[in-house]
Amino acid sequence: HEDMTKILTCVHEYFLKRNVSYYKKMQHTGYLRHLLLRRGVTTGEILVHVITTSQEEHDLESLKEELLALPLEGKIVGIMHLINDSLSDVVQSDETRILYGQDFFYETLLGLRFKISTFSFFQPN
């Protein structure tokens, strides 16, 4: 989806401009691990999750402002910073910081309304 591409580009350029280190899983060093995006197909609500280690400290307020200024078809309803210091290469959270909004979005399917969070399993196939 075009919104996801815009968000990915924004986040990539933000960290590239600031020369922020990416996580090297073999050495277990670096800051930026993953970007997780979730979007409700019918609602257009979007959750943005930036997953990092705690090895560095960065103020993500300006990233939040850049994301919220993007011209999107849908709407960002939540921006989260998840801290993950696990050795495994999996998206999980040792600590979650809500930078903006809420930690869930809604999706509707067959007249039902579902509340979907970061780690919800939702597979409407």
Language model segments and positions:
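Accessory RNA-recognition modules of RNA-modification enzymes
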Residues: 1-124
